[in-house]
Amino acid sequence: MIEVSGVWKIFGVEPEAALKAINEHNLGKAEVLEQFNAVVGVADVNLSINRGEIFCIMGLSGSGKSTLVRHFNRLLEPTAGSISIEGTDVMKLGQTQLREFRNRKIGMVFQNFALLPHRSVLDNVAMPLEIRQVSKNDRMRQAAKILD
């Protein structure tokens, strides 16, 4: 069984502050972007998927489907919430345990493994660092070094 409870993902420099403002002042996505320069990728998702159940996550392009699923194996870390898979609290796993969990309990096939055409080669190479929230200067320096 997969259980997801209260999962949020906010992309930006201060995601926790943005989430606090959302909860305290009922801010919408546009207000979060304007006030915190942050993007709400996943907003308060709750779901349970039983073993063997066929479960469909549907939505428009860019609505957060893949972002949500990437939390199941912690390719993305949620800003808030909990995720449990077959009784294992995924959020409490250390790096070694997480690798073992990914190897034995969960897999993922990416929907698109090509370069992103709207990004430069440098930006494509730097993207994994962006996801890890490395500063722009550091990720550009590291990506340029790799490409050199």
Question: Where are the regions that the model predicts?
Answer:
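The feature captures the beta-strand-to-loop junction immediately N-terminal to the Walker
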Residues: 58-60
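ABC ATPase NBD coupling module
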Residues: 32-37, 90-106, 131, 136-140
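Short coil-to-helix segment of the ABC ATPase nucleotide-binding domain corresponding to the Q-loop/switch region
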Residues: 119-126
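Helix-to-loop junction immediately C-terminal to a conserved catalytic motif
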Residues: 73
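Conserved coupling/switch loops of ABC nucleotide-binding domains, chiefly the family-specific signature
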Residues: 79-82, 138
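Conserved ABC ATPase "signature" region
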Residues: 20-31, 86-89, 130-133, 137-148
